[in-house]
Amino acid sequence: MATVIHNPLKALGDQFYKEAIEHCRSYNSRLCAERSVRLPFLDSQTGVAQNNCYIWMEKRHRGPGLAPGQLYTYPARCWRKKRRLHPPEDPKLRLLEIKPEVELPLKKDGFTSESTTLEALLRGEGVEKKVDAREEESIQEIQRVLENDENVEEGNEEEDLEEDVPKRKNRTRGRARGSAGGRRRHDAASQEDHDKPYVCDICGKRYKNRPGLSYHYAHTHLASEEGDEAQDQETRSPPNHRNENHRPQKGPDGTVIPNNYCDFCLGGSNMNKKSGRPEELVSCADCGRSGHPTCLQFTLNMTEAVKTYKWQCIECKSCILCGTSENDDQLLFCDDCDRGYHMYCLNPPVAEPPEGSWSCHLCWELLKEKASAFGCQA
C-alpha cells in the first residue's frame, strides 16, 4: 500500500524541489507552445484530429491544495459549445434561386442579394472566430515562452552559423539576424567580386572570364545599342551618313575607314564620356567599329596586344587558326590579346570552356608569368 507523503518538501529538500518544479514547468510550457503552433493537425499514429482545448492552466490559476498530498488545485472550467450560424435558420442566408439566363442581365436583385449573403457569411465567420480574453492571454504566454527560449539559444545559433559559413560558401546563404548577418552578406558580396571580376558596365552583371562578358555584350546589349545609335544618327547626321553603322566605309586602298567615335559611350578619342578623360580608340579591322579600351573592359595586356594585329569586334570575331566565324558558341577569347579560337581547333582540343582566365599560346610565349592565366591554366 502506498504511503501518503504529507510534506514532500522535507523529504526532497526545499531548493531541489523548487528547481524540479521550475524545470517541469519550463518543459511543459515549451512542449505546449510547440504543440499549439501545429494545431490543428491530424495525428498520423492515432488518427485523431488534435485541436485546441481548455485543459491548460497558468501559474496565476493555482490555488492551495485541499486534499492530503495535494500541492495545488486549479479552478474547474465549464464546457461550452461554440456558437454557429445555421444557414437554414437565418433569413439572410437563403440560397439564391436559379434564374434563367435571359433574366440575368435584366435584373440586378441577384447581385444585391449575393452581396448580402457574403456579408452575412463574413459576420458568421467573425462570430465563430471570436476568442475570449483568457485564450488570448494563454497565447501570449506561449509566445513569451518561445521568445525566451529563442533568446537563450540565439548566441549558440550565431556561433554555429559562423562556423558553417566557410563550408557552404558556394551555396545560397539564408538571412541571419543581427550584425553577423550583415557581415556574412558583405563577405558574400566580396567573395562574388573576387570570383567574378568582369562586370558589365551597363547592367552590372558579373562573369568569371572575359569570353562570358563578351558573349553577354554581343547577345544582350549590342543589338539594343545598334538600334539606339541608328536613331541618333538619323536625327543628328546628314542623309549621306545614315548607313555608316551598317555599311563600312572603305578608303582608296581598300582598307576599312574606322569610326571616330566609341560605339558604347559615343565619345571620341579626345574624351571618354564615361570617365571624362581622353582615351585612344580601338577599331575593328573588318567593320570599322571603334571603342575605348575601358568601355570594352580591356586589361592592360589586351590594350597593348590589340595594336599588334588586326583586331576584330565581337560581331566580326573569327577563329585565328581556321579563319571562320562559324560555331561562335565554341569560340574562346584570350584574356590577354582578345584573339578568338575554336575549342576544337586547339591542340589538344578542349571540350568545355576552362574556368577562370584563359591565355592563348602566343601570349604564353610572349608574357610568360605575366599572362592572365598564369597559375590558373595547366
Swiss-Prot record:
Q: Could you tell me what this protein is called? A: Zinc finger protein DPF3
Location in the cell reads: Nucleus
Q: GO annotations under biological process?
A: chromatin remodeling; muscle cell differentiation; muscle organ development; nervous system development; positive regulation of cell differentiation; positive regulation of double-strand break repair; positive regulation of myoblast differentiation; regulation of G0 to G1 transition
Point out which parts of the chain are PHD-type zinc fingers, as ranges: 259-319, 316-366
Q: In which tissues is it expressed?
A: Expressed in the heart and somites. Expressed in cerebellum and spinal cord, but not in cerebral cortex. Expressed specifically in post-mitotic neurons (at protein level).
Partners and quaternary state? Component of the BAF complex, which includes at least actin (ACTB), ARID1A, ARID1B/BAF250, SMARCA2, SMARCA4/BRG1/BAF190A, ACTL6A/BAF53, ACTL6B/BAF53B, SMARCE1/BAF57, SMARCC1/BAF155, SMARCC2/BAF170, SMARCB1/SNF5/INI1, and one or more of SMARCD1/BAF60A, SMARCD2/BAF60B, or SMARCD3/BAF60C. In muscle cells, the BAF complex also contains DPF3. Interacts with acetylated histones H3 and H4.
Q: From which source organism is this entry?
A: Mus musculus (Mouse)
* Cross-link position per record: Glycyl lysine isopeptide (Lys-Gly) (interchain with G-Cter in SUMO2): 99
Q: Which sequence ranges does the entry mark as zinc finger (C2H2-type)?
A: 198-221
Q: Which GO terms describe its cellular component?
A: brahma complex; chromatin; nBAF complex; nucleoplasm; SWI/SNF complex
GO MF, one example: zinc ion binding
Q: Which SUPFAM superfamilies match?
A: beta-beta-alpha zinc fingers, FYVE/PHD zinc finger
Q: Where is the composition biased (Basic residues)?
A: 168-186
The protein's job, in short, is:
Muscle-specific component of the BAF complex, a multiprotein complex involved in transcriptional activation and repression of select genes by chromatin remodeling (alteration of DNA-nucleosome topology). Specifically binds acetylated lysines on histone 3 and 4 (H3K14ac, H3K9ac, H4K5ac, H4K8ac, H4K12ac, H4K16ac). In the complex, it acts as a tissue-specific anchor between histone acetylations and methylations and chromatin remodeling. It thereby probably plays an essential role in heart and skeletal muscle development. Belongs to the neuron-specific chromatin remodeling complex (nBAF complex).
Q: Where is the composition biased (Acidic residues)?
A: 148-163
Q: What is its main location?
A: nucleus
Q: Where is region (Disordered) located?
A: 146-193, 225-254
Which top-level group of life is the source organism from? Eukaryota
Alphabetically list the UniProt keywords: Activator, Chromatin regulator, Isopeptide bond, Metal-binding, Myogenesis, Neurogenesis, Nucleus, Phosphoprotein, Repeat, Repressor, Transcription, Transcription regulation, Ubl conjugation, Zinc, Zinc-finger
